[in-house]
């Protein structure tokens, strides 16, 4: 791993060839740092002419749907105290977050109760050292916010003998204890370059979901500079029938877990992966993931099942691989029929890179 990290950290581009597949066809080799030879991808960098459809799709539309604080008052939080007060209110609220809210080196964890929308104002909403804890709650939207735990120095020594942030399970956003109907959209989450900061446990997940949490959609977010991105299911004993959709997210400079997914069913489509050098989509413990129309670039084991007592499965189609290595399946090991319509938001595989890099993250709504 160390050698792989050092190689990646130097951004080596020496014409290492790998296969490229679209629509189940294995194409000719493509070279690292160059455009793939597959013809349609030549259009992938053209700027999309129109704003995409940003409406909610995926598992968060099920189980009664996800509306957040709709119907409640709209309030503005400019301080940590205001955000804490509004987030723990029993009333439905749309909480506008204006500017940077910082918890300093000590850090803070905000408990978010049901029927809330946390909405960043313009491109200014920034939670620095402030984690969001969604525990046993329902109907929550987190949108247009930037989050990091990288400023927190409040740590403890974990069971592996490594330092770990001592609040919010080390996560930027924790969804746990049976929380349902959560939509995280157009956010940016990051910590530190994993090459420069080698302790993989210091910050845990950017967004983790565990303990029977389900009906979650994570869309149009920018995740970067982090080791372990998404833990969906905390262990091989966390056997809930979880249901999570990931679409139109941009993953850059990530080690692994994009996501790691145990049990249940999931949907991973139209995401762009760039410089993911541990594992990509890692299906474990019998999970069946529909993985379609994603663009994988410079990614190790883009779709795989690893480090699991029981292998996971995938329903894979129309994914594109360039400058990748390891497992790049073009056939499926399970079949997943989804309970929702999403054709209105689907992007052609060849256009995913351009669309996602332009429209994912904060300030794009």
Regions found by a protein language model. Name each.
Residues 76, 96, 111, 119, ...:
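Extracellular beta-strand solenoid repeats
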Residues 260-365:
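Extracellular beta-rich repeat passengers
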Residues 84-92, 101-119, 125-144, 149-179:
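Extracellular beta-strand-rich solenoid/capping regions of secreted or surface-exposed proteins
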Residues 80, 100, 233-235:
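Short strand-loop junctions, especially beta-strand C-caps/beta-turns
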Residues 115-121, 138-151, 179-195, 203, ...:
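Right-handed parallel beta-helix
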Residues 128-132, 156-175, 197-210, 225-238, ...:
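Extracellular beta-strand/beta-solenoid scaffold signature
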Residues 71, 91, 97, 106, ...:
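Repetitive beta-strand solenoid architecture
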Residues 2-94, 104, 325-365:
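Extracellular "leader-to-stem" segments immediately downstream of a signal peptide or signal-anchor
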């Amino acid at each position: 791993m160390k050698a792989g990290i050092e190689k990646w950290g130097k951004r080596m581009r020496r014409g290492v060839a790998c296969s490229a597949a679209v629509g189940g066809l294995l194409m000719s080799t493509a070279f690292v740092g160059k455009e793939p030879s597959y013809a349609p991808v030549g259009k992938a960098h053209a700027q999309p002419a129109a704003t995409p459809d940003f409406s909610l799709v995926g598992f968060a539309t099920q189980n009664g749907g996800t509306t957040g604080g709709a119907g409640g008052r709209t309030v503005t939080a400019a301080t940590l105290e205001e955000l804490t007060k509004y987030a723990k209110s029993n009333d439905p609220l749309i909480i506008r977050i204006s500017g940077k809210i910082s918890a300093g080196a000590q850090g803070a964890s905000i408990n978010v109760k049901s029927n809330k929308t946390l909405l960043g104002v313009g491109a200014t909403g920034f939670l620095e050292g402030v984690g969001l804890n969604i525990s046993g709650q329902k109907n929550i939207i987190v949108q247009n916010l930037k989050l990091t735990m990288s400023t927190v120095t409040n740590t403890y020594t974990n069971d592996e003998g490594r330092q770990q942030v001592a609040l919010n399970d080390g996560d930027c956003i924790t969804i746990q204890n049976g929380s349902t109907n959560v939509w995280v959209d157009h956010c940016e989450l990051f910590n530190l370059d994993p090459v420069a900061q080698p302790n993989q446990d210091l910050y845990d997940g950017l967004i983790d979901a565990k303990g029977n949490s389900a009906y979650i959609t994570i869309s149009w977010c920018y995740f970067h500079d982090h080791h372990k991105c998404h833990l969906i299911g905390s262990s091989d004993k966390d056997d809930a029938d979880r249901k999570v959709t990931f679409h139109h997210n941009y993953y850059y400079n990530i080690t692994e877990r994009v996501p790691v997914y145990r049990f249940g069913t999931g949907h991973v489509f139209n995401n762009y992966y760039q410089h993911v050098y541990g594992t990509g989509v890692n299906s474990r413990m019998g999970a069946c993931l529909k993985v379609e129309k994603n663009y994988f670039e410079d990614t190790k084991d883009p779709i795989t099942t690893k480090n699991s007592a029981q292998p996971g499965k995938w329903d894979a189609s129309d994914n594109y691989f360039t400058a990748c290595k390891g497992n790049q399946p073009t056939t499926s090991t399970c079949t997943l029929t989804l309970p929702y319509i999403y054709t209105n938001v689907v992007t052609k595989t060849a256009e995913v890179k351009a669309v996602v890099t332009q429209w994912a993250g904060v300030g794009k709504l």
